[in-house]
Amino acid sequence: MHGTHFLILLLLCGVLGSNGVTPDIKNVAKAERNMHNMLRCLKKNEPIVKSRILTLPPNCNQYVSAVVETWKPEGV
């Protein structure tokens, strides 16, 4: 299932990169920490494949949300 880790990261980076926003200088360390925590959680907990649908482990949702929150555009 290590290929799924790559696909999840690729999908997340594609979505985050498509909005044209990067964290400001003050939040870069926070963004790096959030991404590190998310990857560590995904490494420990395999994604769930059910009926060919890939879902994240429930205990990793908070880390994914933190990454998205760090990278969201201003004013959203």
Curated annotation (Swiss-Prot):
Keywords: Behavior, Phosphoprotein, Secreted, Signal. Lumen fluid of male accessory glands, becomes seminal fluid. One of its GO terms (biological process) is egg-laying behavior. One of its GO terms (cellular component) is extracellular region. It is found in: Secreted. cAMP-dependent phosphorylation. The keyword Phosphoprotein applies. Transmembrane segments: none annotated. Residues 1-20 form the signal peptide. The keyword Oxidoreductase does not apply. Transferred from male to female during mating and may affect egglaying and behavior after mating. This is Accessory gland-specific peptide 57Dc.
